[in-house]
């Protein structure tokens, strides 16, 4: 466990990681990027996602795949896929919510979603997280 001495206290909304890589919000101080990379032993980059600083709120990934805000551009999706080492698909959760982390719990064994998640969303999530 590593404690980051930062003013940000909701790091889960600012960071998306798996065992292969991580995307960190530009609002996280640069001095912590190397610490995060070293502690988790992963490659880490700093970027916004679909114009949002809350990277962890608009992306969710495990070691098999991931989903991202539907307004993310293709170039960013390719870059994030490379860093995380998995395929990432645009998706929504809970009948159209683009903040995918608000309704998804995921690890490499299973994915749990909110009860408002509809059939097409479940199909997208199944495809995304079982690549």
Residue ranges and their predicted role:
Residues 1-131:
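The feature marks the mature, well-folded catalytic cores of soluble enzymes
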